[in-house]
Amino acid sequence: MSFIVPEEIEGYAEAHTTPPAELLAELAEETKATLDSPQMLTGKIEGRLLEQLVHALQAKRVLELGTFSGYSSLSMAAGLPEGGHIDTCEVSEKHSEVARRYHARSPYGDRITIHMGPALETIERLGGEWDFVFIDADKENYANYYEALLPRLAATGLMAIDNTLWSGRVLDESDDEETTRVIRELNDRIVADERAIAVQLTVRDGVTLIRRR
């Protein structure tokens, strides 16, 4: 599914991206067939992007907000260095059940921990700094997640926030739907934040990468 770029460009990019492992392809099919809102699946291109970022950073401590069916956590796990670990937060038992099954079948099952419950509570409980953070949970809390985690990025750490173009709806100032407004306000906050350096990418539904100054 393409959210921003034309379908034919998305298809070309997918065709020139290293294909996902068979287990990820199987997970994608099950997600589309059995779960509500399958468009929430990270997908081939963004999954590889996350893996590349984790690998390039040699990120040992990774935090994900929003496990969904486990595609993104498995993608990132493939880029972990020796001793690296992913903590991922989820509130849906149905989603986490799928993720746990596929994590267990992968080579990375012992390197991913799913934490059930509100992400802000998990963030506070886990403590410490993070080498890489991927935010893809409830949009209404995006600003809270950003504020909680920006100070806790490692000196060379990176934060990735998903869906920051929101199918292009952020462009329409007359669109006052709550999620659209929340994302638009967050985008404005990030670019004006003197603590951060950000780039917004037109990958999938928009991915914003942020580091601390």
Task: Identify the role of each PLM range.
Residues 1-132, 139-160, 164-213:
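A short alpha-helical cap/connector motif
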